[in-house]
């Protein structure tokens, strides 16, 4: 499909450029020993999570629904932070992933 034929509004992601950027981040991880996580608030295009998961260590989430999305679509480390949690949310976060950092 030609870009001129796209119906707008829409998001167009250049996967070649995305892979280039992810490769840079992966090199930073390797060179420094740090972990780089995808901030889902900044980029929540979950269609690309399997690709991103090939390069990064996981996701950050600000609550239960983002944590679930990160687990289901990327399946890697999941860092969750919110100023407060409901008891039911804590229970479900534990069920989503035992490795979640809350």
Residue ranges: model-predicted function:
Residues 3-4, 22, 64:
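Residue-level detector of functional hotspots within protein domains
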């Amino acid at each position: 499909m030609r870009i001129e034929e796209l119906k707008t509004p829409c998001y167009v992601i250049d996967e070649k450029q995305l892979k280039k950027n992810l490769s840079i981040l992966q090199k930073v991880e390797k060179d420094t020993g740090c972990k780089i996580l995808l901030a889902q608030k900044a980029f929540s295009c979950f269609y690309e999570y399997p690709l991103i998961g090939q390069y990064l260590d996981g996701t950050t989430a600000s609550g239960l629904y983002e944590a679930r999305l990160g687990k289901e679509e990327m399946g890697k480390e999941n860092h969750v932070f919110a100023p407060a949690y409901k008891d039911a949310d804590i229970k479900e976060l534990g069920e989503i992933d035992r490795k979640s950092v809350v």
